[in-house]
From Swiss-Prot:
Lineage: Bacteria, Pseudomonadati, Campylobacterota, Epsilonproteobacteria, Campylobacterales
Pathway given in the UniProt record: Porphyrin-containing compound metabolism; protoporphyrin-IX biosynthesis; coproporphyrinogen-III from 5-aminolevulinate: step 2/4
SS bond partners: none
Transmembrane domains' residue ranges: none
Name of the protein in question: Porphobilinogen deaminase
Matching PROSITE patterns: PORPHOBILINOGEN_DEAM
Database matches in Gene3D superfamilies: Periplasmic binding protein-like II, Porphobilinogen deaminase, C-terminal domain
Keywords: Porphyrin biosynthesis, Transferase
Further remark: The porphobilinogen subunits are added to the dipyrromethane group.
Source species: Helicobacter pylori (strain P12)
Swiss-Prot/TrEMBL cofactor(s): dipyrromethane
InterPro entries: HemC, Porphobilin_deaminase_cofac_BS, Porphobilin_deaminase_N, Porphobilinogen_deaminase_C, Porphobilinogen_deaminase_C_sf
Length: 306
């Protein structure tokens, strides 16, 4: 039998992730594999903010099409990019152990967010980050920052931005210091995206190795990520809208924190729930109900106009 084919985007970070799964497949499942690079819509359109491109699955759709055709056997994604509703026949075979979930401030001149001058230009790909930055500093000029990690850092170093915000996990995976000043926000300061820090391996549910890939699943991370995805699903949300949600486990207790609002930070809902792990999905439903009662749907409709 030939090697399994792993579909991956072509960025340095995406290939690190694909190679990480390739190595684990060989070591833990005794399966040989090879990587096929696939360009997605989100990779091709680099001159437009992600929220303006439209549609869900900007970094996953082309990979899913190849899975359905049988051209590739599995697709490795940053879990935060994976839509919460799958194409028929597809699902996540595993969710890997989470890396650092935090967002990180990077700057050449300024040590932290509060030291930025009034009206400073901050680059981010994410409306979620923009919203939470504006909550802290309404004066900031948050602008779209596209490209891979190295491209974004070059834009910072060239003076296009006073600071940029990146995912800590990506910096750690690529072993990048990033800039003179680097400071991670706590989860309380900036609630991450659903699934941030974890990888999701997507396959056909009837693939003969689907069950085998579950050996790579991290139970604790998968549990928390599925809670986050359930919350997003309840709001009919995706990864390009201003919602942050983070679930964490401490023994038999679970905490779910969420934030949702306009990208300008002017209408924002922030809530959290704590409870027993056995009631975790009930807690998600309670949290959803509170968000909906607080006007979440209306805020998300307004957010589409930004």
């Amino acid at each position: 039998m030939g090697n399994l084919v792993i579909g991956s985007r072509g960025s340095e970070l995406a290939l690190w992730q694909a190679n990480h799964i390739k190595e684990r497949l060989k070591k833990e499942c005794l399966i040989e594999s090879e990587i096929q690079i696939v360009k997605t819509k989100g990779d091709k359109i680099l001159d437009t903010p992600l929220n303006k491109i439209g549609g869900k699955g900007l970094f996953t759709k082309e990979l899913e099409e190849l899975l359905l055709k049988g051209t590739i056997d599995l697709a490795v994604h940053s879990l935060k990019d994976v839509p919460v509703v799958f194409e028929k026949g597809l699902d996540l075979a595993c969710i890997t152990k989470r890396a650092d979930v935090r967002d990180t401030f990077l700057s050449v001149k300024f040590p932290d967010l509060m030291s930025l001058p009034k009206g400073a230009k901050v680059g981010t790909t994410s409306l979620r980050r923009s919203m939470q930055l504006k909550l802290k500093r309404q004066d900031l000029d948050t602008e779209s920052l596209r490209g891979n990690v190295q491209t974004r850092l070059k834009k910072l170093e060239c003076g296009e931005f006073d600071a940029i915000i990146l995912a800590e996990a990506g910096l750690c995976r690529l072993e990048i210091q990033g800039a003179k000043y680097r400071k991670a926000f706590s989860v309380k300061e900036m609630i991450p995206s659903m699934g941030q820090g974890a990888l999701g391996v997507e396959m056909l549910k009837n693939h003969k190795h689907f069950a085998t890939l579950q050996k790579l699943n991290d139970e604790k991370s998968a549990f928390c990520c599925r809670l986050e995805r359930e919350f997003i699903k309840g709001l009919n949300g995706g990864c390009q809208i201003p919602i942050g949600v983070h679930a964490s486990l401490m023994g038999d207790r679970v905490k779910i924190q969420a934030v949702l609002g306009l990208p300008n930070g002017k209408e924002v809902i922030t809530k959290e729930k704590r409870g027993d792990k056995t009631k975790a999905f009930d807690l998600v439903q309670e949290l959803l109900e509170e968000f909906l009662q607080s006007g979440a749907k209306e805020i998300l409709e307004k957010a589409q106009l930004f």
